Amino acid sequence: MTLIARFVLIGALILVPSAGTAEQIFLTPRDFLAETFEGEIPKPRVLWIKGELKVAIADILGHKPVGLRIRYWGRGSKTAWILEEIGKYMPITAAFVVDRGQIRRVSVLVYRESIGWEIRYPFFTEQFLGVSLSADRRLSRTP
């Protein structure tokens, strides 16, 4: 193989994204909300991230929150949150249902990583069910 052919091949391998890093949509946000609220999706609400709340969120996440607000949906004591967080390298869109302060459902909606895809399966997500936030801003139990 000539030197030029080697450079072309190496360049192609580096620059062409692998099929494993393609965005995988497991559930659309709309479908998640429809399932959560039995077809009647409530109007979104907004939680503004400022002041003491911003500090608390940074303490919980271990980094400053991105953005100034978080949209969520709620009816009665049940709220649904669709959040995006960087996995190892790429964003992961996850959804959470919280009822009376406890996590009731966790779903991975969109996965963009090439590794760790197993987080979308129930054997992983179910470990968070029933978990709440303690007074010292930590999970009530370690999943």
Label every model-predicted segment.
Residues 21-142:
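Flexible, solvent-exposed loop/hinge segments and secondary-structure transition points
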Residues 7-16:
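Bacterial N-terminal signal peptides
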Residues 1-7:
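Positively charged n-region of N-terminal signal peptides that target proteins for export
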